[in-house]
C-alpha cells in the first residue's frame, strides 16, 4: 500500500534524527514491526503489544516466552497441546472459523483443516519461524493500548505507529471464538473509533515522542491532522 512507502520514509528519517525506540500497540500481525525492521530499527529497539489471543500467541512465540503464562484452554484440545505455538494458532484458527460453519466456504475449509491437520500446523510453524527470524529480539506484552502508549509519552526518542480498530469492538468481533477458546485476557477497554480517535489525539497532544495513528474517515472529519491520505473503500 502507498501509505507503507510513506511510513518507511518516515521511519528511516526518524532513525537518522535520533529515534531509538519503536512502539506498535494494536500489533495485529506485526505489520508495523516488520516495516520498522525493514526501515532500519533493530528488533531489540521494538516494543509491540495487543489484547487479542491470536496476536499474543504469535508475540509470545516470536519473543520466546512460554505459553503457560497465557493459560490457554480450547474445546477439543488438551492444555498440553496448546503449549506449542503452532498448535495453539491452529486451534484458534479452527475455532474462530467454526462459528461460520453454516456457510459452505467455511465448512469446507474446516473439513480441510481436520483432514490435513498436521500440514496446517507445519505451515503455521514455518510462518512463526520466519517471523522470529526477522523480529527475534523484540519485546511483546499482552497489554492495553492506552497503558503502553502512556509509558513512552515523555520519551523524545520514541516513535509510535498505532493502527486501532476501524469500527467499534473490531478486534472482539474478528477474533471471537464464541467462548470455545479462552485465555488470561488482559484488562482493556473496548475501542470505538467515533470517540476513541478523539481521545487518542487528546492523549498525545503534548507528547514528547513522535506519534502516528491510522484513521479511516471522510475528508475534513479526521480527529488528527492528516500528514498522508489516500482514497479507499471497504
List PLM regions with ranges.
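Conserved proline-anchored active-site loop of SAM-dependent methyltransferases
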Residues: 22-36, 48-53, 154-174
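Active-site segment flanking the S-adenosylmethionine/decSAM binding pocket
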Residues: 141-194
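Short amphipathic alpha-helix with an adjacent loop that forms part of the alpha/beta core around
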Residues: 12-15, 75, 148-155
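Class I SAM-dependent methyltransferase Rossmann-like catalytic core
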Residues: 1-16
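Well-ordered, non-membrane alpha-helical segments in soluble/globular domains
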Residues: 4-8, 116-124, 182-201
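Conserved Class I SAM-dependent methyltransferase catalytic core
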Residues: 193-234
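Conserved S-adenosyl-L-methionine
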Residues: 38-45
